[in-house]
Amino acid sequence: MCKSAIYVVNTAAQSVAVGGTIALGSAIRRFGCAVNLNGNSVLLDEAGYYTVDVSIVAAPTTAGTVTATLFNNGVAVPGATASAAVSTAGNPVNLSFESMVRVGCNGNTGVLNVVLTGTASTVTNIAEVVTKI
């Protein structure tokens, strides 16, 4: 049984530049005290392991490959990335990935962000679930 969880969603269209952080919107569901939404970040406030599930709809502004990557404390989480290639600008693509991150002991915290790379895009949906296990 998990101690804490948060479900954040942003369905407002947002223009995200290459290297930009995707705005997470608002918390739809939350329980416990180990995970919190702070602006465009999910904060992990207790030591332990957390699962992270991310789903994104993005429409690249130019043809190319759009990539979304999870960052923890400013560092890309290995394997927590999804990419899709489009041949026509404006075609929406679905990106999703799952990951697990760890917050160490001794007062450490985690700060999770989702960063867009590859090609600038209009993001019309992002949903993120973070669960302390």
Where in the sequence are the language-model features?
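Extracellular jelly-roll beta-sandwich "head" domains, especially the C-terminal globular C1q domain
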Residues: 1-133
